[in-house]
Swiss-Prot record:
GO MF annotations, alphabetized: methane monooxygenase [NAD(P)H] activity
Function description: Responsible for the initial oxygenation of methane to methanol in methanotrophs. It also catalyzes the monohydroxylation of a variety of unactivated alkenes, alicyclic, aromatic and heterocyclic compounds.
Family matches, as InterPro entries: Me_mOase_g, Me_mOase_g_dom1, Me_mOase_g_dom2, Me_mOase_sf_g, MethMoxGammaMmoZ
EC number: 1.14.13.25
Stated name of the protein: Methane monooxygenase component A gamma chain
Keywords associated with the record: Monooxygenase, NADP, One-carbon metabolism, Oxidoreductase
Subunit structure of this chain's protein: M.trichosporium has two forms of methane monooxygenase, a soluble and a membrane-bound type. The soluble type consists of four components (A to D): protein A, comprising three chains, in an alpha-2, beta-2, gamma-2 configuration, is a nonheme iron protein containing an unusual mu-hydroxo bridge structure at its active site and interacts with both oxygen and methane.
Organism: Methylosinus trichosporium
Pfam families named among the record's database cross-references: MeMO_Hyd_G
Native organism taxonomy: Bacteria, Pseudomonadati, Pseudomonadota, Alphaproteobacteria, Hyphomicrobiales
Catalytic activity: methane + NADH + O2 + H(+) = methanol + NAD(+) + H2O; methane + NADPH + O2 + H(+) = methanol + NADP(+) + H2O
GO BP annotations listed: methane metabolic process; one-carbon metabolic process
């Protein structure tokens, strides 16, 4: 193991490492990482309190869940189930159905982000996650790009996040 450098020590990391050390079951660690990702990652995060350290903390939780998963789950479950206990095919089918039922590109974008927060490995086996993520991304791109060129310029300017620049000669 690499020597820990003092520059990386801080009270936030120490506090979270103590919380992570208390995780003893796959169910507990899965809920912990899902709650963490919903609260501290993505554009929809609920808090920026640990913005500098959230990736380090997420990595440590992922490590803990991975260890618990390999210690406590049957080998067959490692490649056929999510750590939530759900069957991989059911997860894939559920989320693809959700995004296909989306009424707008914004709703579809939210569904895709939520899937990533809840199922990013080690919660879901990597091969299943990547395949499902690609399928969701494909549907999202199709929704986003439907008749893009048919949208009037004024309609495009009203899209969330658009900033109109005026060039001066």
């Amino acid at each position: 193991m690499a020597k820990r450098e003092p520059i990386h020590d801080n009270s936030i990391r120490t506090e979270w490492e103590a919380k992570i050390a208390k995780l003893t079951s796959v169910d507990q660690a899965t809920k912990f990482i899902q709650d963490f990702r919903l609260a501290y990652t993505s554009p929809f995060r609920k808090s920026y309190d640990i913005d500098v350290d959230y990736q380090y903390i997420e990595r440590k939780i992922e490590e803990k869940l991975s260890v618990l998963k390999t210690e406590k789950l049957p080998v067959a479950d490692l490649i056929t189930k999510a750590t939530t206990g759900e069957d991989r095919a059911a997860v894939e089918a559920t989320w693809i159905a959700k995004i296909k039922a989306a009424k707008s590109k914004y709703e579809a974008d939210g569904i895709h982000i939520e899937f990533r927060q809840l199922y990013k490995p080690p919660v879901l086996p990597v091969n299943v996650f990547l395949r499902t993520d690609a399928a969701l991304g494909t549907v999202l791109m199709e929704i986003r790009n439907t008749d893009y060129y048919g949208t009037p310029l004024e309609g495009l300017r009203k899209e969330p996040g658009v900033k109109v620049l005026h060039l001066q000669a």
